[in-house]
Amino acid sequence: MRGKADRFRPLPPCVVITGPTASGKTECALSLAQRFPVRLISVDSVQVYRGLDLGSAKPDRDTLARYPHALIDIRDPYQPYTAADFAQDAEAEITRASASGRIPVVVGGTALYLRALRYGLDSMPRADPAFRRMLLERAEQEG
């Protein structure tokens, strides 16, 4: 993943469709997919998780079968997925789509993910599950 130091290293050109919930992002992306050789790449922090279909406006199974989207249903809900993970995965998908002659179309409304993709993130250590457990135990004991 690109960090702040190399944030201006260019990605292959791509189309970005973003906006608030229920603004027609998916419909716009599907319209492009009907007309052009595109690769749809989801930018949604909930749609990455399998089974979290309600409340996320995740395209239904028929739509996904007809118009596959990268980065949908790639994790189980108990598995962490960070903005850094997204940026790395999306960059790979954009590069792969471009190399195969398809137009990468990044579609979704998770602004932090888009920002991480465009500008990178400062280097930070990974979350420490043991430290998290200790903090949760302490909070439970002390309130």
PLM feature spans:
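Phosphate/pyrophosphate-binding catalytic cores of soluble transferases and nucleic-acid-acting enzymes
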Residues: 1-143
